[in-house]
Regions:
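Hydrophobic structural segments
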Residues: 1-168
Length: 168
């Protein structure tokens, strides 16, 4: 059963309204190839390899977190590859970061930041709140293992009871 790009966009906007995006962010429908959608590929970034994967898997739509268009385009750029292959693209960036239940709230849940009293900052792109007491060292190890992130500095035994995170 095919659906339209506009139907999918409507659903995504209900989850992460475009009004939540920062002024500079280019979110929403960035390429509309006009094709009915039977297959959707989701990704962090749209690259030439992702476009090839969409073609190989007969996907008519790619939904990405990071916008595929920020600057003037040239024929070799990914948006042209999307159009040439009849693939539409929807990007949900800072609006999905800021949306209730979006990227920042998900990170808070992973990090154990309490939902009660959780506050938004940085125009919705960050959250701050309390957490169960831990040490910087234990938190760094947890983040490295859970989020597959590197650790830059650890002063191991300082207590942590409040965390702030920014998804971008």
């Amino acid at each position: 059963m095919s659906v339209s790009v506009q139907q999918i966009l409507g659903f995504l906007r209900a989850v992460a309204p475009q009004e939540l995006a920062l002024d500079w962010d280019n979110v929403g429908l960035l390429v509309d190839a006009g094709q009915p959608v039977d297959g959707v590929l989701t990704t962090l970034d749209i690259t030439p390899a992702v476009v090839r994967e969409a073609v190989e898997n007969d996907c008519q739509l790619i939904v990405s977190h990071h916008p595929v268009i920020f600057h003037p385009l040239e024929p070799r750029d990914v948006p042209f590859q999307l159009v040439q292959n009849g693939i539409s693209a929807i990007c949900m960036h800072t609006n999905l970061d800021a949306a209730p239940g979006g990227v920042n709230d998900t990170l808070c849940d992973i990090l154990g930041i309490a939902a009660e009293g959780r506050e938004s900052f940085a125009e919705g792109c960050g959250r701050i709140g309390t957490t169960m007491p831990t040490t910087v060292e234990a938190l760094a190890k947890f983040c490295a293992a859970t989020l597959h992130s590197g650790v830059k500095y650890v002063n191991g035994q300082k207590p942590v009871t409040c965390l702030a995170e920014v998804s971008g």
